Amino acid sequence: MVASVQEDSKASYIYLYKKDGSALDIYVKSLLSGDGYPVDVSLSPGGTQWITSFMYLEQGMIKNKIVFYNFGLGKNDPKRVVGIFLPEDLSDAMAGRVRFMDESHAVAFTDKGLQFLSTRVETSPESTSQILLDENIRRISYKNQYAGVITDNGSGADPYCLRIYKPDGSTVFETTFSYQYTGFDIEGDLVMLYNDNSCCIYNMAGTRKFSGTFDFTVNKVLAGRFPGTILIMGNQKMEEIRLK
């Protein structure tokens, strides 16, 4: 399913659509003057839950809240709301991106770090971990069972720090690096850093598995067709590499 955010002068509306483009009889209406403006929305893999980050004004200050909806169990509330995380629950952070990682875990990427949330009890979402980062957050990435951030490195010679987390907020690995990346993706159990002529690959043990340059412009780096391989995608060329 696909979610679409639409708005008029007084309210915003989040609609759900099937893959064939037909609309479902499910939507959420939010008054801009009260509920705020939806910054980002994410559906659970099963399509019955969604999480939305709202920005709103309170006494002239911009605030942020995260709202969980459940269209299978939230029938007691006409808006299908099952949980709300207010500014005090988020350390007054602003969540610009929210994502369901699986059916019972979600992550909010904020200007202060990451907030991991659980819907194991679907009628009562809870915060499982909050990662507050002092360093400037430069890039984020997420894919199923992993969420990652690249920040400035506060100490040491390397300018950047890469951190990867599980859905419950526990750390998978953390490492510093100096590679000058423009792209950052998580593919399976690999972390892909790349720029227009090279790439650098880490596994989930934090080990660098590959670093190399190419004679063509790199647009994207993907997991390969077979385990232990990656695909280097260019405009008119594709190269498959087997990792050692």
Features from the language model and the residues they span:
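Short beta-strand elements that form the blades of beta-propeller/WD-repeat-like
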Residues: 1-7, 14, 47-60, 97-110, ...
